[in-house]
């Protein structure tokens, strides 16, 4: 009996972490829906567009300005930016809360993004600034254990493709 109790306690402790990862997965997939609409505006080649599917991989790097331009366009699509291309806190929080269990991560994600935004506020080129910000955000999520694994993301991509 003590072994069963210990297992239940471990599951109870792990459940919030899994919920956080699943929320992040859902937000990532939802945000990614704007990518097709932003491809031309941000001058993404097919090859660079494919890179977005690897965003959560450990070795993914933001080396191309166009990726930042695409993220800027996608953020505008969902009305997540102010006129000065900075995060609109309220709209971003509401966007995250619109996903199942989004309230679990909304405030934390806004704080992470804002913290990264402050680090790169000196960058005048919006696309490069947003690219650096996205890299910082990704690293922060990985450090906090809320980043979805590539296996989880690939499973979702496959399930979505099969559903179409």
UniProtKB/Swiss-Prot annotation:
CDD domains: PBP_GOBP
Disulfide bond recorded as keyword: yes
Transmembrane parts of this sequence: none
GO molecular function terms attached to this record: odorant binding
SMART domains, per database record: PhBP (SM00708)
Keywords, ordered alphabetically: Disulfide bond, Olfaction, Sensory transduction, Signal, Transport
InterPro entries assigned: Odorant/phero-bd_Lep, PBP/GOBP, PBP_GOBP_sf
Tissue distribution of the protein: Antenna.
Pfam families: PBP_GOBP
Gene3D superfamilies per UniProt: Pheromone/general odorant binding protein domain (1.10.238.20)
Cleaved signal peptide residues: 1-19
Cystine pairs: 38-73, 69-127, 116-136
Domain of life: Eukaryota
Primary role: Present in the aqueous fluid surrounding olfactory sensory dendrites and are thought to aid in the capture and transport of hydrophobic odorants into and through this fluid.
The protein's name in its UniProt record: General odorant-binding protein 1
